[in-house]
Every structure is written in structure tokens, then in C-alpha cells.
Amino acid sequence: MKRNIHIISMIMLLCTAGLSAQEVAVKTNLLADALTSPNIGVEVKLSERFSIEADFHYNPFPAGKDIRWKHWMLRPELRYWTCQPFGGHFFGMHLMYGVYNVGKVKLPFGMLKEIRSSRYEGEFMGAGLTYGYHFILSPHWSIETSVGVGFLHNRHERYRCFHCGEKTGSGNRNFIAPTRAAVSLVYVIK
């Protein structure tokens, strides 16, 4: 797992060699921030129609006395722009990998009701497709919206208690689900 993260990181570093400042944007997903998932993203122009973006989410903090919402996630994405990078419509293909420790969380729409009474530790990985639009506000500032759907594989262990280590089960799950929902504040470095 760590090896995969190192490989992705090296590829991203190699892609940034020789870049000028006009080809880089830094961003944060405001929706994820509102859901207590602090994050940062960096996007680099590769050509007249392509860019590569990677966002990293990290929350090491407990959400409350018995509530767990700790996680980290890395999601690199290759983007095709219909006009030019950092403006207008884009389509993307992304990979994702993350680790989580969640429990006693009430999710909307009755999703994953089992995490209300147990704690889950595990990892997920997947791939998906994205559609988005980049709204230019000024020469440096933009708002970007995007949604994505894809395939996820989840491995987890279930624990009865939030503080003790009594394991009550484990499992794997494969499913198609939303993989991205973003309204991002973007700063283009010029």
C-alpha cells in the first residue's frame, strides 16, 4: 500500500519538472472542509488540453467523546479540458486510496446504519470518472465544481466498542458509488 502511494507521488513529481508558475493551481474542497475533512489539492497543466490534479484529505482528530471520523485519502486525477486548463468544462479519470477509523456516525439518507453502533477500521481503493466546470472569478481566483462516480473496493474490521479492541467481524465489499463531490476554492499561481 505504501509502495503504491510512493509510486503515485514519484509520478506526480516527475510531471511537475520544468513548470512555470502559470501552469499550477492550489485548491481546497469547501464541501469536504464543511464535513470535517481538511484537504488540499494541487493541479498542474500538462499540455493545451490536459492537466493532472491530486487532492489529499486528512483528519486525525476525534469527532467527539465516542464518535470516530478519522481518515486520510489521496486521489490523483488526469483531466481533459474542452477549452483550456483552468477554465470551462473538464472530464477526468481518477484513482483513490484511503484509510479510515469511523464509528457512531449518523450519515444522511440512512446510509451505512451499522456504523451508528460499531466502529470500523479499514481501507478503500477505487477508480472513477469525473465531470466538472471551472469558473474564473479573477486572474488568480476561481471556483471549481465537480462530481464523480466509480468503483470502490472496501476492506474493514468491525469493533464493538469505540475504545476497546474487541473485534467482532471483518469483511470486503465492492460497489459503485459517488467518488467525488466538490465545490473548490482555487488559487492559480501566476
Q: Each predicted region: which residue ranges?
A:
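Flexible, solvent-exposed loop segments that connect beta-strands
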Residues: 58-71, 99-123, 155-174
